[in-house]
Amino acid sequence: MIKLSNITKVFQQGTRTIQALNNVSLHVPAGQIYGVIGASGAGKSTLIRCVNLLERPTEGSVQVGGQELTTLSESELTKARRQIGMIFQHFNLLSSRTVFGNVALPLELDNTPKEEIKRRVTELLDLVGLGDKHDSYPANLSGGQKQRVAIARALASNPKVLLCDEATSALDPATTRSILELLKDINRRLGLTILLITHEMDVVKRICDCVAVISNGELIEQDTVSEVFSHPKTPLAQKFIQSTLHLDIPEDYQARLKASPETDSVPMLRMEFTGQSVDAPLLSETARRFNVNNNIISAQMDYAGGVKFGIMLTEMHGTQEETQAAIAWLQDHHVKVEVLGYV
């Protein structure tokens, strides 16, 4: 549905040249929810704005629904953009218009008959859960309700693609979850292809089928969500995954934690489990094989793309030789082990 090939985007600021995107290629199949994740300034917003040519690429090809957009005339591009809805971090609603009026606007601009506008807007407001807000004004809506209006407006022309530019960044966690569930429901009901950009791996984990990691204008990793969470290939992907599972060292342990081993001290370990290593009884196996005991301090598990993954803080009791052998064995069995210190 969306095919970006060798996209490069260069901005000129006076005598300074800024390369925002460098040879980016991305394919989003029809009906998928595809996430692009990266830090601020990585090129995410530039990339998504190239899809509907709000930013025209310096080089490369943009195809949506099999149509090459970069060669279209202005009138042809305007028509093609009706098949591409877009929502933003800030809702961009017209304060002087009601909820109904905001959603109706693109249909009015397209000279849609009034009866058809009424039918379509009513249908969309019911879809996004705002069937009772026809006559409300944006000032009287919560942030989540405003974003629902923006989603309804983006769907007014019955697009095949929805672009989401940090659509939940301005929302609280509970509202974020409700908006993501709405997007997932719309994708399922309408078969809508969704491309979203975010800096939060929680967003990707919750609704995406596939994910690409962008850094300094380049896609450095892309795969299914389950594969990236199970076998991240880049340090940046690992960092984003770690951000979804975070365990703080308890204060009493922090007070006792030493950088080097002392008499009778034991290593404190941070273990990350993904894929098959989550369900395998690896800790009990290390106890049998190496005569070590693991005291679990805290642990957290989660799911992404149907794959379970988790993190654990433990004390490993045993001799230095036994604990080193146990750690090496765990690493051989796809557990990431970090020695945080000694307690």
Swiss-Prot record:
Would I find ATP-binding among this entry's keywords? yes
Q: Name one Pfam family in it.
A: ABC_tran
How this chain sits in the membrane, per its record, is:
Peripheral membrane protein
Q: State a GO cellular component annotated for this protein.
A: plasma membrane
- Taxonomic superkingdom: Bacteria
Record key words, sorted: Amino-acid transport, ATP-binding, Cell inner membrane, Cell membrane, Membrane, Nucleotide-binding, Translocase, Transport
Q: Where is the ABC transporter domain?
A: 2-241
Q: What is its EC number?
A: 7.4.2.11
Query: Annotated Gene Ontology MF terms?
Result: ABC-type D-methionine transporter activity; ATP binding; ATP hydrolysis activity
Respond yes or no to whether keyword Transcription is given for this record: no
Catalytic reactions of this protein:
L-methionine(out) + ATP + H2O = L-methionine(in) + ADP + phosphate + H(+); D-methionine(out) + ATP + H2O = D-methionine(in) + ADP + phosphate + H(+)
Q: Spell out the family assignment given in the record's similarity comment.
A: Belongs to the ABC transporter superfamily. Methionine importer (TC 3.A.1.24) family.
> What biological function has been recorded for the protein in this entry?
Part of the ABC transporter complex MetNIQ involved in methionine import. Responsible for energy coupling to the transport system.
What is the designated name of this protein? Methionine import ATP-binding protein MetN 1
Q: Which gene encodes it?
A: metN1
